[in-house]
Amino acid sequence: MEKGKTSRLIPKFMFSHFSHHVATGVLIPLLPLLRESFGLNYFQSGILVSSFSLAYGMGQVPMAILADRFSKRLIIILGLIGVSLSGICVSFTQGFWQMPPFFVLMGLLGGTYHAPASAFISQNISIDQRGRALGMHVTGGSASFLLTPAMALGIASMFESWRPAFLLLALPALLAGGVIWLTTSEPAEDPLIPDKGTGKRLAEEKAQEAELTWVGIARAIGILVCLTITMNVVFASINSYLPLFMVDHHGISAEWAGIVVSLIAGAGIIGSPVGGALSDRLGRKELILFSLTLSGPLFFAVTRSPLWVPLILSLFFYGLTMSARMPTTESLIADVVPVRRRTTVLGIYFFMTMETSGVITPIVGRLIDSYGLDPVFTGIAIGLCVVAGVALLFRRHI
């Protein structure tokens, strides 16, 4: 892809990322309205959530393999269109049991986006700007987490029904699929290599990477990626219970407690591009270890900060630090893994994060039921500090 086109590529994929998560993120904020409309109990509500989330995780690796085998661009386009049509179909359902199949379909088709999009972007952006580009791409998802609940509830309130929210918020993904289809093309090479100074060395490194086996990939980046997956899983589990922590520990209302997750997502709008850009300058490993090192102390600060300004600052910097490692890890994978396997490795990475989070979150909930929020959150903070200490001690071998 020509240089002029690459400068316009990232805004298109930021919009696609935003649209993807808007279409797939409508369910949770509208769940109370669905429960009221169909008279659902907690078990049935859980079926709706699980039918999407389990399929979403399970779809990552198969879709990534298809993208490596055929076309990343085609898989992305079909996925965006499919996710949109699935959301539209949900808006026309007339009974509870009509909904799970469409959420399963939405989840499977949702697996077409993250790994193929990250691989496609990395294949079109020069290696010295890859972290910044992937960081900007992540902000599209972060913005959707911040805005989707308000948009979904606002539309539902305006039309006095949940159906228009599913319908209208599915349309941007359809538009994004059309934009990617009409304005992008298959990349001719991987990746654009700087012409000055390091071009020869980078070309030699790329030739070596093309020969990497699965064992070689695991040796090169396995430990760092596992550290990131650990942070991702802990981050997802913590986010699930932070609103409850705000209510129980600080006594604030449930409505205000729900803003906590939005605040962390808002921090990601800054943290992702900054973290990606810093990784271009300082190195991928250094940024991942830096994020890991700060995660424990900052989460401990969240659990101990008094209400309002200190707590808001702790939450913001916690979200900032945790979001910095996402584009950095994607860039690390793109730097090392050959093109023919890159989407598959990214798919495995996203699969491990999503499915492990789904298992660990209820375990954390069970521990909270048994021992209370404060001891469990403190234990998690200490555990993160221990993991960071061990990683720093052996950093030369990672």
Locate predicted features:
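Conserved MFS/SLC helix-loop-helix module at the cytosolic interface between two early adjacent transmembrane helices
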Residues: 58-94, 279-285
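Flexible cytoplasmic inter-helical loops of multi-pass small-molecule transporters
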Residues: 184-210
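Helix-loop-helix hairpin linking two adjacent transmembrane segments in secondary transporters
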Residues: 137-186
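Extracytoplasmic gate region of multi-pass secondary transporters
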Residues: 27-28, 219-265, 269
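C-terminal transmembrane helical hairpin of 12-TM major facilitator-type secondary transporters
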Residues: 282-329
